[in-house]
């Protein structure tokens, strides 16, 4: 792996430095320099000197910002997404045709060479209107204004007049729905007001920034698209917001609003998995390190866009961990390694002093390990505890303990919320498909694991079995299996009879009986059902139901082994730990004390989190 994730920030510390940046930007503009000079001349005659400073800020930081030029391929992908948004499904061949589209080869139109004076002036004037006229912005200083309200773009989208369009479309919210002065409450009012038209989650394609005008009409995409939409909307009505993210494995983004208290409060405007802004609370995801997209900061790539700053301390406060580095790795910088499944993802780089490295501002309760530039483990794994102390995880082979394990990775709040959609679901039988007198077979309890069982008390044979989620919960069912015996040795073969319409092309009803516990059937919002045909009347004595899940619980028949990290010597297998699962909980003995562990599935999958033994069970870090 080539480690290129060097995230940092620079600050302009003098007027001469800002002047040099401005001169450099004007020189880089080439034939477009007159447009930028026109902006500066316009504001030199404006009595509000802040506007000239804002113009200088935007122009000074403009180098490296660009929009990707639309292409026939990108237009085709956007057309497929628009159809998915409008009709919820699209021809699978058409979907597959564009699934492998990549935006990497799209041409770039650099702002410094193409932006017009009229566009920039209109953007600056509208941003200042919102700074000066919105009561919740009285606390904003100039630097916060420049990053949270002023920017004319959010990514690599084409330049367009999104601010005017969004203000006209959504100003009714601040005109009549919410007229207070609390930005957090305003964000939640927007969330509640437009929730029925919020984002439909779709990550079928690799996408560049799609632009505010397209997202206004087509609210579909992944977390980045929903965050872009939220920034366009909220900045257009004067709310100071930004986009935060983490970089490990699958990158996730969300939004933050600057409260009048000076705190940044997280939220995410997604219809089903989103979250309102709640002071002092985030979404519970493990972050490790957190970064914020800024217009005027140095970036991770050669052309300095997109640009990120480290804001981890906004979430967890300041802290530091000082750890010893092996002699072989002291010749250069070392990286903060984040455990992402079987890889170590570098988060930030520090220099080694007196044989030690000090990593600042990291999430407490999360395991890290120092690594060299070529990915070599450079020291012992560690974490910061709740008191701010650094805890080293060095295996004690002279002291062993017993341990149980029921998962490969930590259970996230999203996972539990998804599984809970099965809680209270009603399972009924009937001799006919219209269920005139349904036979109660059971009700699903609150799922804590993947495999769940119901043993019907009814002795009446049935030919059809119906699964109905409890309203207002939605259908999210991984598997439904029926048995003639309580020991689950005699499976009843079933076929689909009828079902409510699926919500997505890849979440069809057949997934609930395909034998693959990672696929699932997802119904549309509102009442839904699934009816299975047993072919003939049968006595159903056991029902196995599997909620939609991440397939990281213990899986019957898979072979596992327990491993521990022995510092720079790498991962080692706990002696005698290899076992084939016959239950949903695995039991191990002879586990080294104080060790960082992982449960390795030798049969399938790559998602394996790290944990320690606590009270005989797993505590994921």
Label each PLM-derived region with a short phrase.
Residues 374-400, 482, 609-621:
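Structured interaction patches on ligand/partner-binding surfaces of diverse proteins
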Residues 356-367, 373-375, 459-461, 590-593:
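Short Pro-Gly-centered beta-turn/loop motif in secreted/extracellular proteins
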Residues 318-328, 411-412:
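A short, amphipathic beta-strand motif
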Residues 332-351, 426-443, 550, 556, ...:
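Short amphipathic beta-strand segments in non-cytosolic proteins
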Residues 37-38, 46-218:
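Secondary-structure boundary elements
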Residues 21-23, 27, 45, 177-181, ...:
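Hydrophobic/aromatic-rich core segments of domains that either
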Residues 13-14:
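C-terminal motif of bacterial Sec signal peptides marking the signal peptidase cleavage site
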Residues 401-451, 457-461, 472-540, 546-555, ...:
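Disordered, acidic Ser/Thr/Pro-rich linker "stalks" and the adjacent N-terminal cap
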